[in-house]
Regions:
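Structured loop/turn residues at beta-strand edges in well-structured enzyme cores
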Residues: 17, 68-71, 91-93, 151, ...
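Core dinuclear metal-dependent hydrolase active-site scaffold
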Residues: 1-11, 77-149, 236-242
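Cap/insert and terminal regions of metallo-dependent hydrolase folds
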Residues: 117-119, 127-132, 140-237
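Active-site neighborhood of phospho(di)ester-bond hydrolases with catalytic His/Asp-centered motifs
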Residues: 1, 18-30, 48-50, 134-139, ...
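Phosphate- and divalent-cation-binding pockets in alpha/beta enzyme and binding domains
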Residues: 1, 31-34, 56-59, 215
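Pre-active-site segment of Zn-dependent metallo-hydrolases
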Residues: 1-27, 33-41, 142-149
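Long, hydrophobic, well-ordered secondary-structure blocks that form the structural core
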Residues: 37-77
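Short acidic/His/Gly/Ser-rich catalytic and metal-binding motifs that mark active-site loops
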Residues: 32, 104-106, 164-169
Length: 242
């Protein structure tokens, strides 16, 4: 994916990268193992994450410790108090971490007893255009403060993991409900679709889609329901301009 996208791999030199810093929203395996592929960077990575994520990444899933045997990292603690911050080289962009109610990974001491900072979404604002995007990859409950960010965004990238709560267990891939894993399904009353259809302003895009989800079939009835509600399904190479 990096090699196929020139802004992230401009190839100006050997082992080049267009990545200036890295933001981590949680310590889940599939959200963080990509750091290992970036271990040969020519200097320590500047990584932005909450304290609880940092603790997971240095204990139960110690990727940061492993990176320390290469170039290492510079950790920048992210507040859970919804305080906007900026990142050097990310010109005209303001980031705000927003605590989400979801689930901590199995190796976290907060499993089934989460604390603010185990999972965050992001408001990402372009100060030149005045527009903003809200990103929420793991969302178990849509709390009031999260709904306000959704309502006021120009683009929403939101958890689209499953269509039904029991989808993965019915498919035989595991014995858990999506809600037990910190994901709100799309089709139930009060689920992701109901939430998105109540929003008038933003462009609505589903992300973090599990391979059991029938919306991946463009000809499925479920996909037709999304289309009729102007809800998009993300895809590799998708380019979003705000």
């Amino acid at each position: 994916q990096l090699e196929s996208f020139p802004p992230l791999q401009p190839a100006r030199k050997i082992r080049d990268t267009g990545i200036a810093s890295i933001i981590i929203t949680d310590s889940q395996i599939d959200h963080t193992t990509g750091l290992l592929s970036l271990r040969e960077h020519d200097k320590p990575w500047d990584i932005y994450c909450t304290k609880s994520v940092y603790e997971d990444m240095t204990t139960g899933f110690p990727i940061f410790n492993i990176l320390g045997h290469f170039r290492g990292i510079n950790w920048h603690e992210v507040s859970t108090d919804q305080i906007p911050y900026t990142i050097p080289k990310a010109d005209n962009i303001i980031f705000t971490a927003v605590p989400l109610q979801s689930e901590a990974p199995p190796y976290s001491p907060h499993r089934h007893n989460t604390v603010p900072g185990d999972n965050v979404g992001y408001k990402i604002e372009d100060t030149k255009t005045g527009k903003n995007l809200f990103y929420a990859p793991g969302l178990g409950v849509i709390e009031d403060h999260v709904y306000e960010y959704l309502k006021n965004a120009d683009v929403v990238l939101i958890d689209g993991t499953v269509w039904t709560d029991d989808e993965m267990s019915r498919s035989g891939v595991n014995d858990k409900l999506a809600s037990e894993m910190g994901h709100l399904d799309q089709s139930s009353k009060g689920g992701i679709i109901d939430t998105l259809t109540s929003l008038e302003k933003p462009r609505k895009i589903l992300i973090h889609i599990n391979n059991t989800n029938p919306i991946l079939n463009e000809d499925s009835d479920e996909r037709k329901i999304l289309n009729s509600n102007n809800i998009e399904v993300s895809y590799d190479g998708m380019d979003i301009i705000i």
